[in-house]
């Protein structure tokens, strides 16, 4: 469960099924779904089956250490 200060992300799910945690709400996701994650939104994804998705990042700076980690319980 993480958030970014400087970047937005768009995830497009190509194959598989999973659960998306986005700002405390859980949603089933799968093939054909697209999710827009704005900077500051807490997010994580868990595969029910093997997941394949494309992530596109935008913002500045796009750096590896632009991540803040948070505790998350998938049973919430």
Whereabouts are the PLM-identified features?
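Short acidic-glycine-tyrosine-enriched beta hairpin
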Residues: 10, 24-42
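Short hydrophobic/aromatic patches on the structural cores and recognition surfaces of FHA
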Residues: 16-18, 32, 53
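Double-stranded beta-helix
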Residues: 44, 48-76
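Short beta-strand His + acidic residue motifs that chelate non-heme Fe in jelly-roll/DSBH
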Residues: 1-2, 20-21, 37, 42-48, ...
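Beta-strand-connecting loop/turn residues
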Residues: 16, 25, 49-50
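Short, conserved beta-strand element in jelly-roll/cupin
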Residues: 3-21, 59
């Amino acid at each position: 469960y993480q958030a970014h200060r400087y970047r937005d992300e768009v995830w497009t799910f190509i194959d598989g099924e999973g659960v998306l945690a986005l700002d405390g709400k859980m949603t089933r996701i799968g093939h054909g779904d697209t999710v827009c994650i704005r900077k500051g939104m807490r997010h994580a994804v868990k595969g029910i089956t093997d997941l394949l998705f494309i992530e596109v990042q935008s913002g500045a700076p796009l750096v590896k250490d632009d991540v803040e980690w948070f505790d998350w319980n998938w049973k919430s």
